[in-house]
Structure formats: C-alpha cells, structure tokens
C-alpha cells in the first residue's frame, strides 16, 4: 500500500509556503505540494493540507514563539495531541496531557516523514482489519506481527508509539 491510497494526487501541484525552506524534509514538502493530505490517515492521525498547516502554524508560533522555525505542525490526533515536523526532518508528537507545549514536552519519534507515511498506511490497514474483526489482536501472532512491522518501519518504533492497540 502506498501513500496515494490514502491521499489522492492533486491535479495541479501547489506551491508550498516559504517557511518550510528551513525544514529538512523534501519528502514532506513534495507530499504537501502533490498530495491531498487533508484527510484522516487512521484514527490517531489527520494530516493537514497546505492551507490548514499554514493556519495551524501561524497560531502555534503566535502562542509559542519559541517553537517558530523549529517545529512545523503537520497534523493532529483529534484529541488535542498533534504531530510535528522538527527542523532536522524528524517527526515528533505532542501529548496535550503533558500541559503547556514546550520543546521539552515534545517527543521525538526518530522517524522521517516517509516513515510516518509508511506507519500511517500500515495503521490504516490495521484499523480496517479491526473494523471487521475487533478480536484481531487476541491472537498473539497478530500482536507480534504488529510490533514487528512497526519496528521494521523504524527500529524501536513500537515502544515509542503513543497509542496502544492492545496491552
């Protein structure tokens, strides 16, 4: 499954905002320009299209100026948490339960945007499976396959992923 299965291609690529030039993620800039990212990827992530990302980041930087140029909000969980692109190209996550947003409250996922898309595609598949078989993770082999797949996307990702599908 590739990202185009979750996000349709735009008929005409868009120009992206100049603020993104400071962020080391050509794949995110390309996806923002060529894919319609304005949709829920899976239950815990909705990515923003270019217009929504600009609005979200203007607000973020107005409220938290220390984040300007260091973090770019790419999406949200719908629960008050959100996904960020850090200046070095890593994807990070902010948990609203931690209180006021500060750089110390932002968790580095240590994955690239391409890995985040791979994670999104896989989790969308898992959520479709769970829609038809809510006991899917009752099978130990399925739980292990889930953990193994996340760890193939990025070493140690299963342990870093904030939402639990089973415990």
Please state what every model-predicted region is.
Residues 139-141:
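Short, low-complexity segments with poor structural confidence in diverse proteins
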Residues 1-87, 133-137, 147-167:
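A surface-exposed partner-binding patch
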Residues 87-89, 94-100, 143-144, 148-152:
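Secondary-structure transition/turn motif
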Residues 94-128:
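Compact, glycine/acidic-enriched structural inserts
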Residues 73, 90-97, 127-135:
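A short, terminal or domain-edge coil/loop segment
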């Amino acid at each position: 499954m590739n990202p185009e299965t979750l996000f349709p291609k735009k008929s005409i690529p868009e120009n992206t905002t100049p603020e993104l030039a400071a962020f080391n993620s050509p794949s995110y800039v390309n996806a923002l320009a060529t894919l319609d990212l304005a949709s829920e990827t899976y239950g815990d992530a909705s990515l923003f299209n270019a217009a929504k990302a600009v609005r979200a980041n203007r607000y973020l930087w107005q409220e938290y100026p220390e984040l300007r140029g260091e973090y770019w909000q790419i999406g949200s969980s719908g629960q008050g948490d959100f996904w960020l692109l850090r200046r070095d190209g890593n994807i990070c996550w902010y948990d609203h339960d931690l209180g006021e947003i500060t750089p110390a409250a932002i968790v580095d996922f240590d994955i690239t945007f391409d890995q985040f898309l791979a994670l999104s595609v896989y989790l969308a598949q898992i959520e479709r499976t769970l829609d038809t078989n809510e006991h899917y993770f009752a099978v130990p082999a399925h739980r292990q396959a889930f953990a193994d797949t996340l760890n193939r996307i990025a070493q140690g990702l299963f342990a870093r992923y904030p939402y639990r599908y089973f415990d």
